[in-house]
Amino acid sequence: KLKYINPPFETERISGYDFLLDKLSGKISSAACEYVFTRDVWKKTGGFVRFPLAWCSDDATWAKFADYTAGIISLPGTPVYWRNAENKNISNSMRFDGEKLKATGLFLKWIGMNYRLNLRESRFQDALVTYVNVILECSVRGNYTLKDLFSLYAILRKLSPTMALRVLRSHILKAKLFI
């Protein structure tokens, strides 16, 4: 059963930055099985970006591959169908929330290292704030402590103090003292 179809790209080819902008802002939603790349690209770029549980690894990897190959193209035709085993993967499990938060922090650091020049753009900052809000509210369903929140805040603060304060202000009263 088809649940979601992404809107088409606005241009024939999008950069790694534009992919991240769309992904972080929630404009597109995709899974690893929707991306095709050559072994040569994989080898020449150093393979997959590694984060705990591979959480965020796919998005970082596709952005990296896109920057290496001058973009991602969308193939027209039938959408990809894939089986999402409800309650059988890490996305739906509270058991891995701590590792998801750690990986999210590493992903944010990766973005800071690879897209530093874009961090001044308000639309990129808005997308990053939206992304962190979705992680805290949906992916870990509010299952985070003040320590977790301040860890993300410290990482975001290095990217943009304003961005960090926006996230902190939205979640400080929702954080648990302990889990």
Language model segments and positions:
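Catalytic core of nucleotide-sugar-dependent glycosyltransferases
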Residues: 54, 70, 78-86, 91-119, ...
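Amphipathic alpha-helical repeat scaffolds of TPR domains
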Residues: 125-138
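Hydrophobic alpha-helical core bundles mediating ligand binding, dimerization, or RNAP-core interactions
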Residues: 59-62, 104, 132
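Membrane-interface aromatic/basic loop that binds lipid-linked glycans or pyrophosphate carriers
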Residues: 135-179
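Conserved nucleotide-sugar donor-binding catalytic segment
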Residues: 2-95
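Structural motif
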Residues: 119-126, 167
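Short intrinsically disordered, low-complexity coil segments enriched in acidic
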Residues: 1-11, 36, 163-168, 172, ...
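Short amphipathic alpha-helical interaction patches enriched in hydrophobic/aromatic residues
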Residues: 45-49, 115, 139
